Design a protein with these regions (language model features):
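Alpha-helical transmembrane segments in inner-membrane proteins
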Residues: 1-339
Length: 339
């Protein structure tokens, strides 16, 4: 029999899922070339079932070729960043932990900047950003493993160090980049954007995202134990070191995949887990799926604003910062905050 918290958690997860489906339908119709919801449904169904066309070729191109990849990627990136943030906050028992806490984002930024400097294609930029992100976290873990002291503290300190190192490397790449073509491309990538997304980018991101997300969801019952005291968790028969490693690896793969395909989109992994916690509580059994769905809703909503608010598209990383910075201030002013 489910507890009151469990029933509340399931209720909010169902509500969030319905909201996401409604927002998905709305998002397909939004844009410079508006498409009615009824036509959106018919166009999407036509990819599976035989449907008599009642739409124009321009409508189909807008929905399938332009908006579908971008909408899918927005949901994937938003959901995975939120899941990674939730996992990191549980592992480090720190409400201020975010997906970039171990230097994954800084590593991806350096890889992307270097790839642009070397003249790589868009796929090459994505691939090098992903590899560089994983490399940065591998360095963090290697340093923390050799250091003496509390493993969680050593990971945090190593993450700060490696993140600063890769940020410095990115700054140097920007310094030597061609100011006419390469520097603007690097700067725009660092601001984060889903512009020009194609299905190959969605396919590239889907594999590591599934590799990272599925184990996290399967382990969400055990992740709760990482919030306990180290000795208390071990007394319950949990190998905290191994569990922490698995959770960090999964969250790192998620972060690396997200940053590699979308650039720097900050605050999602910090803000959404906190808002989800307000809805369903701190039990990861409900918090992790709720945070994942809520993250998809949030980033899809922000992306809709990004591409429709002005004639010129606003980089999505700027808009998420407008939301995240005030929320960070709110967290700082709370009496019960944990730093």
């Amino acid at each position: 029999m489910r507890t009151r918290e469990g029933r509340r958690g399931l209720l909010f997860i169902c509500i969030l899922a319905v909201v996401l489906l409604a927002l998905l339908l709305l998002s397909f119709g939004l844009g410079r070339y508006a498409v009615p919801p009824a036509e959106v449904i018919r166009i999407l169904l036509s990819r599976i079932f035989p449907v008599t066309p009642s739409w124009t070729e321009q409508m189909e191109t807008a929905v399938i070729s332009i908006r579908l990849p971008r909408i899918l990627l927005a949901c994937m990136v938003g959901g995975c960043l939120s899941a990674a943030g939730t996992a990191y906050q549980s592992v480090f028992r720190n409400p201020m932990a975010a997906p970039d806490i171990l230097g994954a984002s800084s590593g991806a930024c350096f890889g992307a900047a270097l790839a642009i400097l070397l003249g790589f294609s868009r796929s090459g930029v994505t691939a090098l950003a992903f590899v560089s992100s994983l490399l940065s976290v591998a360095l963090v873990y290697a340093i923390a493993w050799r250091a003496k002291g509390n493993p969680v503290t050593m990971l945090l300190l190593a993450g700060v160090m490696i993140g600063s190192l890769f940020s410095a490397c990115t700054s140097y790449v920007k310094l030597v980049a061609d100011p006419t073509n390469q520097l603007p491309a690097i700067t725009y990538w660092l601001m984060g954007s889903l512009s020009g997304t194609r299905m190959n980018a969605v396919g590239f991101a889907a594999v590591p995202m599934l590799i990272g997300l599925v184990p996290l969801l399967a382990l969400r019952w055990r992740i709760n134990l990482l919030t306990l005291d180290e000795e208390e968790a071990r007394s319950m028969g949990v190998n905290t070191g191994r569990l922490r490693l698995v959770v960090i690896l999964c969250a790192t793969v998620l972060t690396a995949a997200c940053v590699a395909v979308s650039g720097m989109i900050g605050w999602v992994g910090l803000v959404i887990p906190h808002l989800s916690r307000k809805l369903v509580g701190s039990n990861c059994r409900y918090l992790l799926p709720a945070s994942t769905i809520f993250g998809a809703i949030f980033l899809l909503l922000v992306d809709n604003i990004s591409r429709n608010l002005l004639a010129t598209e606003i980089p999505i990383g700027i808009l998420t910062a407008f939301v995240g910075a005030p929320f960070f201030l709110y967290l700082m002013t709370r009496k019960e905050q944990m730093l």
